[in-house]
Structure formats: C-alpha cells, structure tokens
Amino acid sequence: LFTVTVPKELYIIEQGSNVTLECNFDTGSHMNLGAITASLQKVENDTSPHRERATLLEEQLPLGKALFHIPQVQVRDEGQYRCIIIYGDAWDYKYLTLKVKA
C-alpha cells in the first residue's frame, strides 16, 4: 500500500526566510524513481492563478522524501498546501499549512 505521510503539518516561518516543506512516502519495496511524480499545490479559496513557488529537491526522492523549497517566504505564500505523490498507478496526498510571521 502506497502512503504519504508528513512529519510536520504546520510550519510557522518568519517573512523573508526560506522554508522546506517535507512529505515522506513509502513504496513498500524497491523504488522506481522514474515512476514518481511529486507536486505541491497551494489550496486556493479563489480562482486567481497562483504561480507555484516551491521547488522540488529531487535528490531526496530515493530516500522516500519529497522536499519542497520555498525561498523568501511572503505573506501571500501563507495557506494550506496539498502534497501529492504519484507512484505508477498509486497515489496519495497530505495537507500542510504554512503560516507567515510578518
């Protein structure tokens, strides 16, 4: 069974600093890196387009970690994010919350 977990659900970050949001996943056996797609989506209440600012640190994927780096966090980055990991035909997601201290 493919599952995604988050070691930390809430991140409280000073405005202007960097943050790395972490999602962990367990493939249950040998990992085929080519079959993994990881994404972080901001959950928006409105329909305005949101430019994704998070960068996936791919070197951690073989360790079962999807790390998403957001540089120089701004108030507009605050909110709920959905971390989605797709592995072949299986997928799972978890929610993370980012709060910004101005």
Protein language model features and the residues they cover:
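Ligand-binding face of N-terminal immunoglobulin V-set domains in extracellular IgSF glycoproteins
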Residues: 24, 51-99
